[in-house]
Structure formats: C-alpha cells, structure tokens
C-alpha cells in the first residue's frame, strides 16, 4: 500500500551500553523539527560511530553503534551557555572564528575521533535514550570509521 492508514509499529532499537566508548564523528547535518508548542527549530546533529558492537541482526551482521547528538543551533557559537558551545569546547574544537557554512563546520568535525561517555536517560513516555555526557579529544589517530554509515546528505539525495 502506498499510504497506509494503519499505525506504524515502533521500531525496536538497541541502546548503546553506558560508559566510555571510542568514537569518530561520521556525519553533521541540520534538521527542522516542530516542538510540542508548534514552534519550528533548526537542530544541528552530530553522528558518532563508536567502537561498541550491536547485537547481530537476522542476517548475522554485527554493526557498530551510532549515536546522534542533537543540538540547538545557537545565534552565536560563542554563547557559553549553549550546549553546542560546551560540546565543541570539551572536544577541543577551535570555533573562535565561527563557521561561515555547514561545510566549514563539517571540515572541523568529520572523521575527528573522540572519547565519549554514554549515559541513559528516560523520556516522558518511558523510552530509554542514549545521551552523550562527555566528548573528549583523542591524542593520535583514534577510532576510525568502518564505512558502514551512510551520510544523511547521501540518503536525502536519493531517498527512495
């Protein structure tokens, strides 16, 4: 059926184990979301692939976890109270000059390794979410992407 009128099944997902994980940033993109109040906000999403493995799927394939880190797009990256400011500062990224475009931001974060501390939080609906409590810089090469993750811009270009 092209457009179903049946409620969609909730897709089960595996929670990332809590604790420390070696990771690498594999994507950065923006999304427009509508809040509970009907307000439209732009979010900047950082996607980290970690060294932790998911349980094997039905085909026996075992992939690495990916964690999506959703951030409000601030009026100024220099706003010290903003979560994105705190995340980038903790990660050791120089943002003193700002970023003129998403592409400039991507150059600073893509393929950059990090040591993440993952914690679980429970939403209002009882769903357990993975959250990044800390994102620390890594000396040396660090964890490298496996190549299994497809960037959003590549998915969006050909969604079907």
Language-model segment annotations:
Residues 1-160:
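Short beta-rich binding modules
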